Amino acid sequence: MGIEEYGGGQGPHSDVLVVTTNDVPGYRVQHVIGEVFGLTVRSRHLGSQIGAGLKSMIGGELKGLTKTLVETRNQAMERLVEQARVRGGNGILMMRFDVTEAADVGTEVCAYGTAVVLVKA
């Protein structure tokens, strides 16, 4: 798998800055908009599940599941950023992911944080 298949995060020219911290050095929070989140639920692919079961017996990375989870997290992030953008934010503080099982048929990934308006300090 190439780097683009198992990584994620923001591009260098995003108009909404997403951080996992309470603040951003060199900026101050002008306005707190509030909580925003991006959510997606992915069903389990039978082929990946069978492959994962076999792979778990011999060990090693479950590449099919890794790729699916990366795509899922990236989609949740895109939705999170869009929510902040449409509410007038240019930053998201304290971004986190929450991953849970969804009714035994899939995986729910939620990216969440606090949308804010940031200005240079």
Swiss-Prot record:
Top-level taxon of the source organism: Bacteria
Positions of transmembrane segments: none
Stored Pfam families: YbjQ_1
Family annotation (InterPro entries): UPF0145_dom_sf, UPF0145_YbjQ-like
Similarity remark: Belongs to the UPF0145 family.
Protein name: UPF0145 protein SAV_4658
Organism name: Streptomyces avermitilis (strain ATCC 31267 / DSM 46492 / JCM 5070 / NBRC 14893 / NCIMB 12804 / NRRL 8165 / MA-4680)
Phylogenetic lineage: Bacteria, Bacillati, Actinomycetota, Actinomycetes, Kitasatosporales
